[in-house]
Amino acid sequence: MPEGPEIRRAADNLEAAIKGKPLTDVWFAFAQLKPYESQLTGQLVTRIETRGKALLTHFSNGLTLYSHNQLYGVWRVIDTGEIPQTTRILRVRLQTADKIILLYSASDIEMLTAEQLMTHPFLQRVGPDVLDARLTPEEVKARLLSPRFRNRQFSGLLLDQSFLAGLGNYLRVEILWQVGLTGQHKAKDLNEAQLNALSHALLDIPRLSYTTRGQADENKHHGALFRFKVFHRDGEACERCGGIIEKTTLSSRPFYWCAHCQK
């Protein structure tokens, strides 16, 4: 499943296709969204924001399209006039003079006003996005030490979108390897140096993955252009200490680590 870097890269591709261009045609599959087709025609997409695995498509008239891909949703970009070859079910089509963006198979789609955006249940639950350039290590450290999160094992915490949005399994194992910790640790048990290292890694590793394009390789391994240190490398030698990378299951997800240098 794609994580924050892949979601942000997808948003970048959508923005590159239609941002700042008048919408010449708008179509929604769901009846409750049909009234917005005429309201959005002629408007501009001003930006596309990511909040974890949700996309917020902001329009020049103040409305925002909320969409969450869940397991099966996918966005596509095509040239205007092109007929896509797919068996997926179309949910959203936003068209400009030269490009069209299409959302297939997703079911969690809403149109929100500015006021509704501030009170949306998912957006209220989700934590700050690790790819938000405004988020600092100091703020991450404060969240780690907050009463809500300080007693949580990292094995589960680093998958919890209410802690930090955009984290997922490959980021979890790479972050913990980077700071030399296992998934059983809790923030309340770390010393100052460990807390500082983890606070930085929680931002640095996702941002590194994003800047290395956060894409999938030909085998659809998400994040494959980001060079993994331990993820999917069980049985290989750890590049830091030479120990053998192991694999187990933590919080119902595959977990990779070096038992020799992660303590």
Curated annotation (Swiss-Prot):
Organism encoding this protein: Salmonella typhi
Function: Involved in base excision repair of DNA damaged by oxidation or by mutagenic agents. Acts as a DNA glycosylase that recognizes and removes damaged bases. Has a preference for oxidized pyrimidines, such as thymine glycol, 5,6-dihydrouracil and 5,6-dihydrothymine. Has AP (apurinic/apyrimidinic) lyase activity and introduces nicks in the DNA strand. Cleaves the DNA backbone by beta-delta elimination to generate a single-strand break at the site of the removed base with both 3'- and 5'-phosphates.
Cofactor: Zn(2+)
Annotated keywords: DNA damage, DNA repair, DNA-binding, Glycosidase, Hydrolase, Lyase, Metal-binding, Multifunctional enzyme, Zinc, Zinc-finger
InterPro entries in UniProt: DNA_glyclase/AP_lyase_DNA-bd, DNA_glyclase_Znf_dom_DNA_BS, EcNei-like_N, Endonuclease-VIII, FPG_cat, MutM-like_N-ter, Ribosomal_uS13-like_H2TH, Znf_DNA_glyclase/AP_lyase
Reaction(s) catalysed (UniProt annotation): 2'-deoxyribonucleotide-(2'-deoxyribose 5'-phosphate)-2'-deoxyribonucleotide-DNA = a 3'-end 2'-deoxyribonucleotide-(2,3-dehydro-2,3-deoxyribose 5'-phosphate)-DNA + a 5'-end 5'-phospho-2'-deoxyribonucleoside-DNA + H(+)
GO biological process, one term: base-excision repair
Protein name, per record: Endonuclease 8
Record EC number: 3.2.2.-, 4.2.99.18
Domain of life of the native organism: Bacteria
Cofactor binding note of this UniProt entry: Binds 1 zinc ion per subunit.
Active site: P2 (schiff-base intermediate with dna), E3 (proton donor), K53 (proton donor), R253 (proton donor)
